[in-house]
């Protein structure tokens, strides 16, 4: 029988006892990893690892294309996107494809094209993945030195980092070009209830763009999540794209400084842990962004935010009761505070009742009714437009409630109502994935640091208590 322990790793690995299962000739004896450790077997086989990554990209792109076509096939133009459980079409609509004034879908053909392009691309990636996994060279260092690497080669690693940064910067500029030159993007703040427009007057002032980073993350400030006009969003992408591209060039041309060589662990598993940490941060930020921000994620497509649905309810009943003769400026609620309107601690007029906690909501249907000091009583009495009433009633009944098992809506709702907002889905999924990525970061960072410190082999098995105990049988 072959030895149970690989030459490389002395801690116990639960695996097949005959040790004969070898996947594509890369077995536990030669690599130190069993088949189920996946790409860990390919740590030193750059060609095969390339195949695994290209095939993985193919799976991702195939999902995007297939899911895109599935959503197009099921799409009903008469219903809002957020009522149909769509998570991809809202992103395409936000980019200005296929929609017109008010977020109304006027053409689904661009969505079909997007799906087909992704499916075709996935076939190319799938072929490349299979080729490099099965037919291509096991290692790239000999035949294609530019694409080869050694994990310990600090200079090569920062060059690869630089290439990645440049690609990210190009991605950021693709959005900029779409907004500036290729038809524009959807702006929920456009007059009259949202429209597609080209963004002409970019915000490039560093004090504005980087001011977002210096804001507090809490209510009324909201860090970068508080961005509420497209000029700032697209201008931010100009800054971000430029920083990524220049940072990429810098990392390609330079070698790591001595402090970085000392401070960081330079191994494949360490790079994996750094990447997982970065993706985790991205996931948590995306969670907050999709939950609170109705500019980057317009409510016409994703449904209202939580605060927006709550304020919409207060507004809807203010409109109703005002029509029935209530004086909304002075009516007292059950707690002695204003029933419809009240003052915040700093003096602004805000909606009363439970929705007071969402006083800092900004939404396109509500802002026209504000004055210099919060909600304007005379505008609330004279200027409310039918479109504002319709939209707030719609948002009130589509709050982003609902659980992960798709049991939708408010707990008191009748069973026939089964509405789950895409905001709930997207923010919850990104939070959960961000958390798992963070745990993966801790796991791989711990292993990488242990390996670098030289105690990867684990506990000394000679002194385990179990060895001195009577066998179970």
Swiss-Prot record:
TM helices/strands, residue ranges: 69-93, 134-155, 178-200, 255-275, 291-312, 447-471
Localisation: Plastid, Chloroplast thylakoid membrane
GO CC annotations? chloroplast thylakoid membrane; photosystem II
Summarizing the function annotation, the protein's role is: One of the components of the core complex of photosystem II (PSII). It binds chlorophyll and helps catalyze the primary light-induced photochemical processes of PSII. PSII is a light-driven water:plastoquinone oxidoreductase, using light energy to abstract electrons from H(2)O, generating O(2) and a proton gradient subsequently used for ATP formation.
Species for this entry: Olimarabidopsis pumila (Dwarf rocket)
Q: Which family does it belong to?
A: Belongs to the PsbB/PsbC family. PsbC subfamily.
Q: Subunit comment for this entry? A: PSII is composed of 1 copy each of membrane proteins PsbA, PsbB, PsbC, PsbD, PsbE, PsbF, PsbH, PsbI, PsbJ, PsbK, PsbL, PsbM, PsbT, PsbX, PsbY, PsbZ, Psb30/Ycf12, at least 3 peripheral proteins of the oxygen-evolving complex and a large number of cofactors. It forms dimeric complexes.
Enumerate the Gene Ontology biological process terms.
photosynthetic electron transport in photosystem II
Membrane topology term: Multi-pass membrane protein
- Which residues form the pro-region? 1-14
Keyword Phosphoprotein applies = yes
What are the UniProt keywords, alphabetically? Acetylation, Chlorophyll, Chloroplast, Chromophore, Manganese, Membrane, Metal-binding, Phosphoprotein, Photosynthesis, Photosystem II, Plastid, Thylakoid, Transmembrane, Transmembrane helix
What residues bear N-acetylthreonine in this entry? 15
Q: What is this protein called?
A: Photosystem II CP43 reaction center protein
Which residues are involved in binding [CaMn4O5] cluster? 367
Q: How is the cofactor bound?
A: Binds multiple chlorophylls and provides some of the ligands for the Ca-4Mn-5O cluster of the oxygen-evolving complex. It may also provide a ligand for a Cl- that is required for oxygen evolution. PSII binds additional chlorophylls, carotenoids and specific lipids.
Question: Which Gene3D superfamilies does the entry mention?
Answer: photosystem ii from thermosynechococcus elongatus
Entry keyword annotation includes Cell inner membrane: no
Recorded hits in InterPro entries, A to Z, give: PS_antenna-like, PS_II_antenna-like_sf, PSII_PsbC, PSII_PsbC_sf
Q: Which residues carry this modification: Phosphothreonine?
A: 15
């Amino acid at each position: 029988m072959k030895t149970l322990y690989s030459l490389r790793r002395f801690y116990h690995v639960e695996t097949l006892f005959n040790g004969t299962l070898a996947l594509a000739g890369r077995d536990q004896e030669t690599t130190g990893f069993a088949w189920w450790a996946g790409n860990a077997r390919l740590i030193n086989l750059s060609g095969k690892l390339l195949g695994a990554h290209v095939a993985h990209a193919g799976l991702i792109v195939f999902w995007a294309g297939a899911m895109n076509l599935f959503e197009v096939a099921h799409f009903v133009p008469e219903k809002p996107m957020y009522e149909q459980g769509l998570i991809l079409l809202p992103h395409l609509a936000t980019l200005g494809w296929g929609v017109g004034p008010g977020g109304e879908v006027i053409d689904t053909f661009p969505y079909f094209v997007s799906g087909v392009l992704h499916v075709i691309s996935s076939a190319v990636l799938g072929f490349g993945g299979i080729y490099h996994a099965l037919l291509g060279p096991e290692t790239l260092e000999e035949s294609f030195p530019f694409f080869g690497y050694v994990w310990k080669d600090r200079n090569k690693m920062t060059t690869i980092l630089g290439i990645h940064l440049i690609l990210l910067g190009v991605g950021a500029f693709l959005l900029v070009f779409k907004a500036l030159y290729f038809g524009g993007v959807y702006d929920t703040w456009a007059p009259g209830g949202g429209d597609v427009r080209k963004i002409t007057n970019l915000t490039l002032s560093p004090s504005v763009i980087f001011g977002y980073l210096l804001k507090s993350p809490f209510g009324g400030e909201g860090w970068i999540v508080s961005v509420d006009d497209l000029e700032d969003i697209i201008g931010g992408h100009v800054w971000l794209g430029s920083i990524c591209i220049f940072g990429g060039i810098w990392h390609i041309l330079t070698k790591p400084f001595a402090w970085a060589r000392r401070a960081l662990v330079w191994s494949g598993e360490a790079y994996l842990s750094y990447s997982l940490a970065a993706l985790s941060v991205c996931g948590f930020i995306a969670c907050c962004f999709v939950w609170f921000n109705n500019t980057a994620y317009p409510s016409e497509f994703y449904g209202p935010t939580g605060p927006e649905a709550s304020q919409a309810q207060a507004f809807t009943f203010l409109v109703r009761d005002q029509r029935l003769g209530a004086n909304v400026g002075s009516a007292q609620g059950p707690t002695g505070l204003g029933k419809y309107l009240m003052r915040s601690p700093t003096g602004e007029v805000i909606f009363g009742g439970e929705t007071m906690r969402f006083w800092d909501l900004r939404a396109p249907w509500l802002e026209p009714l504000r004055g210099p000091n919060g909600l304007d009583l005379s505008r609330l009495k004279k200027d409310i437009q039918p479109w504002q009433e319709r939209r707030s009633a719609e948002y009130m009944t589509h709050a982003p409630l609902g659980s992960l098992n798709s049991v939708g809506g408010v707990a008191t709702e009748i069973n026939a109502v089964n509405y789950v907002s895409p905001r709930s889905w997207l923010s919850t999924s990104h939070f959960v994935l961000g958390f798992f990525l963070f745990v993966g970061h801790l796991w791989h960072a711990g292993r990488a640091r242990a390996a670098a410190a030289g105690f990867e082999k684990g506990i000394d098995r000679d002194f385990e208590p179990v060895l001195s105990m009577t066998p179970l049988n």
